[in-house]
């Protein structure tokens, strides 16, 4: 089993034929004041709550979550809670990011579609595990900021585009996995159509909280596509911003 707390420096090389991040063992980076917080996040929020995939744990322990949140919230970046990122949107709590990523069952050759780029954090985690990530964001300012952050961190296997998540990204379909980070009222069949047979769709579905204070009701669905249709593998109560 990979030790998720080993010190590595990730190098994203455009010369790698598969676009897979290369790992170089390095001494602990004393210049990173958040390294110990990431380690504690993985130990206390993820492993203790059942996240087991060593590749997911390693990715969560490497991606600098504090660089995907507003600067005045960086001291809260590794807490077990969502945080606002502007425009009425949030970055999901670390456990939800890890849970959805693990549910997607990614391999180093996977091609992934993300609906709802937001800050770009989920896309970065996916990029550590997959060959290529395509991410759609409805809000142009968030799409631009996420692309800038991802590029600055060296991610060459992520492409971000402003667009309507309900339409997906048919040019690159079929996808091995599709993750949706906002809640539609029902499962978008267009996204299932863009999923490869054997692929997984992870999507929160249901009503979002209303301005009047009603809580709403949502479930995180894990749907696996088969040659005959699709099979639901799980449903868990969650609370996401609405998909619009």
UniProtKB/Swiss-Prot annotation:
Its main location: cytoplasm. It holds the Pfam family PCMT. Residues 1-39 are annotated as: Disordered. It is an enzyme of class 2 (transferase). Gene3D superfamilies: Vaccinia Virus protein VP39. Keywords: Cytoplasm, Methyltransferase, S-adenosyl-L-methionine, Transferase. One of its GO terms (molecular function) is protein-L-isoaspartate (D-aspartate) O-methyltransferase activity. One of its GO terms (biological process) is protein repair. The active site is at residue 92. GO terms for cellular component: cytoplasm. It comes from the Bacteria. Its EC number is 2.1.1.77. InterPro entries: PCMT (IPR000682), SAM-dependent_MTases_sf (IPR029063). It is found in: Cytoplasm. It catalyses: [protein]-L-isoaspartate + S-adenosyl-L-methionine = [protein]-L-isoaspartate alpha-methyl ester + S-adenosyl-L-homocysteine. Belongs to the methyltransferase superfamily. L-isoaspartyl/D-aspartyl protein methyltransferase family. Catalyzes the methyl esterification of L-isoaspartyl residues in peptides and proteins that result from spontaneous decomposition of normal L-aspartyl and L-asparaginyl residues. It plays a role in the repair and/or degradation of damaged proteins. This is Protein-L-isoaspartate O-methyltransferase. It comes from Synechococcus sp. (strain JA-2-3B'a(2-13)). The lineage of its organism: Bacteria, Bacillati, Cyanobacteriota, Cyanophyceae, Synechococcales. The gene is pcm.
């Amino acid at each position: 089993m990979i030790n998720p707390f080993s010190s590595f420096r990730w190098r994203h090389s455009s010369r790698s034929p598969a676009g897979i991040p290369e790992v170089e063992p390095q001494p602990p980076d004393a210049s990173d004041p958040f390294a110990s917080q990431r380690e504690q996040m993985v130990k206390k929020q993820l492993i203790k709550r059942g996240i087991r995939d060593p590749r997911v744990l390693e990715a969560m322990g490497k991606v600098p979550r504090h660089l995907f949140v507003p600067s005045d919230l960086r001291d809260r970046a590794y807490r077990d809670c969502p945080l606002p990122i502007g425009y009425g949107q949030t970055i999901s709590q670390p456990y939800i990011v890890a849970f959805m990523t693990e549910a997607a069952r990614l391999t180093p050759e996977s091609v992934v579609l993300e609906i709802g780029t937001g800050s770009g954090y989920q896309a970065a985690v996916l990029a550590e595990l997959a060959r290529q990530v395509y991410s759609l964001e409805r809000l142009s300012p968030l799409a631009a900021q996420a692309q800038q952050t991802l590029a600055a961190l060296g991610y060459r296997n992520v492409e971000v585009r402003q667009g309507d998540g309900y339409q997906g990204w048919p040019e690159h379909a079929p996808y091995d996995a599709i993750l949706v980070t906002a809640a539609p009222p029902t499962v978008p069949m267009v996204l299932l159509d863009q999923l490869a047979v054997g692929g997984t769709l992870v999507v929160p579905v249901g009503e979002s909280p209303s301005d009047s204070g009603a809580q709403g009701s949502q479930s995180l669905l894990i749907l696996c596509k088969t040659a005959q249709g699709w099979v639901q593998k799980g449903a868990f109560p969650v609370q996401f911003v609405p998909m619009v």
